[in-house]
Amino acid sequence: MECSEKPVFHNYTVRELALLRITPPDEAVRKLVKKHWDTLAKPLDGMGSFETITAQIGAILGTEVIDIRKKGVLLFCADNGIVEEGVTQSGQEVTLAVAKSMARKGSSVCRMAQSIGAETIPVDIGINSEESIPGVWNCKVCSGTRNFLKEPAMTEEETVRAIATGTRLVRECKEKGYGILATGEMGIGNTTTSSAVTAALLQCGAEEVTGRGAGLTDQGLARKQQVVRTALETYDLWHADAFAVLQTVGGLDIAGLTGMCIGGALWHVPIVLDGVISMAAALVAERLFPGVREYLIPSHLGKEPAAVKLADALQLSPVIHAGMALGEGTGAVMMFTLLDMAMSIYGQSATFSEIEVEQYRR
């Protein structure tokens, strides 16, 4: 499928993009959802974080009658020029191979999503190949980013176009009836780009946020950390704004995910975040548009060292602590299942009045 329509921000400059404003979720609805939870025949706050999260989802959707049965996972696939520096175990050909697997519904996230009735939507936003892949949405901005040790990863125009693509896809999904979306990605080298983005935005050292990715050796990890450190120093990224950081050391997948987070806030669609790649994009989005985080649902806390720092910076509390590092959106899809379970209680459980028991009071 082609991304034929011009993105929402297609002709915007960075300054014009910055003029957009995010409206907050509906606080009145949030209170109604919380009030309904208290009427259910269970201990007060018995579902813990899930009561807060469902109230957030209701506030985002603007209704206490919450319907998130139609779920989608946007999988942004892109290559990263920084792989030239030996920061990964595999080459860019793997991005294309996994994207094809996603199109056939064969990858990990696709199998998980299919098991719960969620739809996976692979998106070519920057694979380093001119091959057209049946089953993958062709939204290519360019054929991968540049090696950011030699030059900025993207141009300003490419960065805006990638953000715009993510935002527009959220709108299209909402128009097609999706009630909730999850972030997913595939791109060899994207734990390097996300580490660089995270270190710059949180003003911390490369070694604090750069992990082994798909399983680097000690030597490989040291090389990866040095690459991130060099980029931070070369471009003085600790003093750069979020857009400049994204453009300089980010990836097209991260930019697309950034747009997806922004789109969730603009179109009032709850966005379930996956791991560090998604959370790095979410932090960029929040820095560009304060308030975006109110539209984001955390899923899991992975084993990459940046995970805790990103969650803290976003003031989000992931509920799954399983040491996962698979990527693709797998943690977010797991969260879909937990949300469905919580919603089965919220929408169907007996109330105190129905079982003729006095309601607990706060």
Question: What are these regions, as identified by a protein language model?
Answer:
Residues 1-362:
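N-terminal loops that bind phosphate or other acidic moieties
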